[in-house]
Amino acid sequence: MGKKVLLTGFDPFGGETVNPSWEAVKRLNGEEAEGVSIAAEQIPTVFHHSAAVLKKAIEKHKPDVVICAGQAGGRAHITPERIAINIDDARIPDNEDREPIDEPIAADGPAAYWSALPIKLIVKELRKNGIPASVSNSAGTFVCNHLFYQLMHRIDRTSANIRGGFIHIPFLPEQTIDKPEPSLSLETIVEGLRIAAVISALHEKDIRETGGSIS
């Protein structure tokens, strides 16, 4: 039986009219590639509500792998995240105008969780296909990191036979018309997430080689 991957993307936030994570993952919904089936769901950019929506999506699709994607304006690469940390520290309000400062995500949780995705292998395969990619060592402290941490905390506490992680993606070109930020085309992002989904489903173990960045 083939593997199933659940991809999630966020709704727009911070004054943007689109969110590239949702624009990309919704184009992969229902696809099959190399025996891997892909489903996609949208997550609200809301601290207190995002994990509940993800929980329902996991219960609905019963995936083998969950990859949450999010927008990281200012980054030039597709960046699989290495670690989720147990803190909310918002620089801007979320989409329900909540702005938690220095608040733990889970009072009974560990300081951090490692990604369970083969992040170095994903980077290698993306680069092999001409897609700029690098490992990120910080998912920030906004809703992206919050969801990443909640995903891994849920997997840990329920002993679910699921592997999960998070991937940040750059702005789309239309988002950078009025700001000097890097971007990637939607087609490139879609292909990058397709590759990441297949690699994550077919490979549980990562490789050990350079794939990160200085910061």
Curated annotation (Swiss-Prot):
Active site: 81, 144, 168
Catalytic activity, as annotated: Release of an N-terminal pyroglutamyl group from a polypeptide, the second amino acid generally not being Pro
A GO term for molecular function: pyroglutamyl-peptidase activity
Localisation per UniProt entry: Cytoplasm
Leading EC class: hydrolase
Annotated EC: 3.4.19.3
A GO CC annotation given for this chain: cytosol
GO biological process assignments: proteolysis
Keyword Cytoplasm: yes
Pfam hit, one: Peptidase_C15
CDD domains tied to this protein: Peptidase_C15
Annotated InterPro entries: Peptidase_C15, Peptidase_C15-like, Peptidase_C15-like_sf, PGP-I_bact-type, PGPEP1_Cys_AS, PGPEP1_Glu_AS
HAMAP family: Pyrrolid_peptidase
Function (record text): Removes 5-oxoproline from various penultimate amino acid residues except L-proline.
NCBIfam families listed in its UniProt record: PRK13197.1, pyro_pdase
Assembly and binders: Homotetramer.
Protein name as annotated: Pyrrolidone-carboxylate peptidase
Organism the protein comes from: Bacillus licheniformis (strain ATCC 14580 / DSM 13 / JCM 2505 / CCUG 7422 / NBRC 12200 / NCIMB 9375 / NCTC 10341 / NRRL NRS-1264 / Gibson 46)
